Amino acid sequence: MMRIKQLLAMAIMLAVSTTMSAQDKLFTLEDLNYGGNNYANLRPKNMWLTWWGDKLVNTDVEACYLIDKKTGEKTVLFTLDDINTWAESNDEKYVRHLMNASFPYPDQPLVQLGNRKAVILVDFEAKKMVWQDSISGQNAYDWSKDSRATAYVEDNQLFVADGKGKKHQLSTDGSREIVYGQSVHRNEFGIDKGTFWSPDGQKLAFYRMDQSMVTDYPQVDIFPRNASYEPDKYPMAGMTSHKVTVGVYDLNTEKTIYLQAGDPTDRYFTNIAWSPDSKTIYMFELNRGQNDCRLVSYNATTGEKIAELYRETSDKYVEPLHPIEFLPWDATKFVMQSQKDGYNHLYLFDKNGKELKQLTKGPWVVMKLVGFNQKQKSIIIKANKEHPLHHRLYSVNMKGEIKQLETVDGVHNAKLSASGSFLVDEYVTPTRPRVIDIVDISHLSPLTSHLLEAEDPWAGYQQPIFECGSIKAADGVTDLFYRMVKPHDFNPNKKYPTVVYVYGGPHANNVQASWHWASRPWETYMSQKGYIVFILDNRGSQYRGRDFEQATFHQLGQIEMQDQMKGVEYLRTLPYVDMDHLGVHGWSFGGFMTISLMTNYPDVFKVGVAGGPVIDWKWYEVMYGERYMGTPENNPEGYAKTSLISKAKNLKGKLQIITGYNDNTVVPQHCLSFLDACIKAGTQPDFFAYPGEEHNMRGHASVHLHERITQYFEDYLK
């Protein structure tokens, strides 16, 4: 009996010890960082979902399942073995998983799948492959479900293969200087591709970019025995830019015409759209100064200009990001997005350019037009109508009446079914890492079915304390939102070294009502090391309206620094923040902000780590740089004020600068020029370059990067 009691006591002690050990488990960067060996195991559980018409399909590795939208029950639709058997797969056609399965035809049992060598279309009721296309060696692959024709780039030339596989070569002069069928204008203005199929699949609009006149930036590949010269075309602010034209290829006539848009010099063509009848092409045309934007229509057969439908000007800039979208139930009307009233909203036009109605309005932003509900004649949108940090889903009818489609605060993303009657609502909240609901929006009141509630994948680890709040901007009026990450055993009576993490630039914000208030995993790692991390979204960041973003116009970094210093003032009021041990870190625009803060407020920040930093905007690219700063010729004071070269002499604290050796976004000239200025000024920054890496470190190099950043603060801030 005594022996049994002893064993029981030992078992209890072991269980308690194991529980404590599990609760005390520490993160490593292999756990937290993208590219880490254990990163995938600490992600919230997910389901990969897609629509087959109005039927919901779960695409998994080994099988695709049909999901009952009310109960969530799963029925096998087909398996991976089925697909490879029906397709009589060889090495080229062999499908390795079903995660990327898509169902392009709402009323047909056809699934499209692919690998790096081929794309196939399989009839899973007839159990046979009905179409295939070899894609080995191809880039910019674009498939039309209507004609089953494909567009692609091979050896710099643009090709189209029709639905029967007949190959048509559209270009012969393609090169690194003459680029066909790929994204242009350095992916600005919402551009992410270079080919655009007409709705009937019989015509292909495509970009042709002549960048022969653009200066080469001298990148070097150091990995061969003899390092090789691999230049990038990089148009810097105020310098000669490329010229873009838009071609249209007709499958029936096998002829190409070009839109008669006039001289493309110093102009941007973006947001290409088709009319529902495939006869007309629409695009936004923007001047180089980016303050005069026009929506223009063209005859898709002749290339002739039809009409200028809309014009928007600004004393700062206009930034078109979205193509127009025609109403599925009325081909004579389209919806356009614009910030012309101060916030991004939807406007209804007729096809001749007459504005019929502003469909959404108010001091909030339409973040995405998700799609259309044809039965209710409504538009499904994502917007921050309730609060700047919450991204919610709404339905908007043609009268401008808005109805909310879900009931939970947080950050929502939607996938809409073919008819628009159902949507997959995947959302997160500060305390819920992933939830997936199915919403039936065909009723007067939306009906919701619950599909997934992911458990906390970090359970059992030492988790920090995540907080969110707001302070006033430097203007004394505007609310700015912050996130603070504290050690898990935070003691308000102690003082903690604190790091300000900053981005601060356009088209990004760091604080949202998502899991952990959108905290980056590195912040958790730093809190585990005993730091507080503070993140503030200053004026200039996204989703707060036009005036909030454009407050930084022609003076990047200045208003942003004023707001960040308001954050520092707030930190100074907190007794647990050690103001003698304050650091700052950021990447890209955040790297620019880091060095700006270190050199404009040298007595405030003790340590900084700046990654991929812009040093002088005259070395940045034309499209982004000139939108916010103008050119060095028309805004010399702004360029001089924001340049960090003249501020190298102000550096007092420890500063580490990190760059990808082959960065083609913020080219190494920035970092190297600042180092040269520091040499001349007698200041001593540290420098580290990642060979072969571009603007962001990929794969496991990212783990190394974040260990280096962390160690720098460990060495000099504590």
Feature-to-residue mapping (PLM):
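Bacterial Sec-dependent N-terminal signal peptides
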Residues: 1-25
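Sterically constrained small-residue positions within well-ordered secondary structures
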Residues: 13, 40, 149, 237-239, ...
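Beta-propeller folds
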Residues: 22-405, 409-410, 421-422, 432
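Serine-hydrolase catalytic core recognition
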Residues: 216, 273, 278, 413-718
